[in-house]
Amino acid sequence: MTVPQLLEHRIDTLFEQLPLVGRLGQAFQEAGHELHLVGGSVRDALMGTLGHDLDFTTDATPDQTEAVLRTLTHATWDIGRAFGTIGARIDDWVVEVTTFRTDAYQPDSRKPVIAYGETLEEDLVRRDFTVNAMALNAATREFHDPHAGLADIVAGKLRTPFPPERSFSDDPLRMMRAARFTSQLGFTVTDEVRAAMTDMAGRISIISAERVRDELSRTLLTDHPRAGLDLLVTTGIADHVLPELPALRLERDEHHRH
């Protein structure tokens, strides 16, 4: 099966097995808005491993989003209206819908200045890795892949939409996510991503200990945590977030030499 055939097959399978996506797309379209399945939801659907959480992006404002969702369910909640996100439970699925965003970062902070965007392309380019920067129109099934994320899935590569130095400067926690996805997806980082992680390892220190811990826990809970931990050690990030880990590796290497 060719890649285009596989793409078509996986999209057809998604809409057949999960008609909710089409229902949501139609509801937003009838209200005059776009709705796109996005991020890890698209990645997982294309890999045949879709979970029970669905992430969408839209040109609708949070108030408009809530109004549309209320036509399908009474179980809606405000996840973070300031960030443009409204949540809902429909059938057995948890749905999060976020208004198109363009984020700006200050050099000394990880917290973005949130602004609503006008286009899907603006929203996708701000995402962490190309494999998470794809979108699928929930009404028309049109596939958007401006940063060649599908090719990176096929190649098993982690690459950033922006140059990695800019991406990791904006949000250093993305370096921890690279380790998690290495373990979770079985992918490898590109040479450029690895070099940027090595050069910018110290920038992880601006991230709160709680958020680092949460990301590290997600890595440890994957089926293959060693791959991600090895990446943290070889890039020097572990020296800042888990200094015991490089020390254990050094002790093991010295033991093997004796």
Where do the protein language model's features map onto the residues?
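Catalytic cores of the polymerase beta-like nucleotidyltransferase superfamily
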Residues: 1-258
